[in-house]
Amino acid sequence: GGFRGGEYPGIAAAMELGRSLDPQEIHGSLIMLHPVNIQGFWARREFIVPEDGKNLNRVFPGNPDGTLSEKTAGLISSSFFPLADFYVDLHSSDIHESLHPYVYYPGQPTEELAAKARSVAKVLNVEYMVRSMATGGAYNYAASTGLPSLLIERGGAGLCLHEDIEEYKSDLKNIMRKLGLLNEPVKPRRYIPRDVTDIIYLEAQETGCWLHHIHSGDFVEEGQVLGRPTDLFGETLTTYYAKQSGI
């Protein structure tokens, strides 16, 4: 957890889980890295590693002779991923963002790997699991090497709420049960994730102040207003609408 220093719930969950687990009860090996971007964590910086201004999660597989971000990614790619049978990346919305809890699983490079990741995603207490065909980021790079991976998104907006930490720890322990690291059955959860495969990404075409008309997790109808950017005097520059009905 902690590729981005301002995404706190996953960092806190890894800290607490590491202290609470009994090594005698773990079958196999569990490796936890947190917070990976410790410079950004102490500086309370969103997205980037302060020393080089790069998004650590976007420079994989990294470069041992590059900047700090690239060296960190290179070390994880060369020394950590080869040891793992399954990789879980803990995220949340960054300091200036909000989100509804969900999980990404890689849709490539093979259907067998996607099915393995999807089967583990199903034990999480989130409403949605999203099949990603992207190639960027640590978990997608891990998948490209044949390592089944997940990226969980839970909590955020610069907060580190107790309920998000507890939900994260429950998710992680259920993953450990599913993978056989804990010799006990998967615990019941409130949600069974629905598989989402049709994703639309909107990018702003203007520079301005974003005023949203909806909230994370809302269901929207096709044509519904999502939000509008304004200039610094409050003049609406354009309006963005939902291209189809969905979450």
Give a label for each model feature.
Residues 1-247:
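Structured catalytic-domain cores with a bias toward divalent-metal coordination
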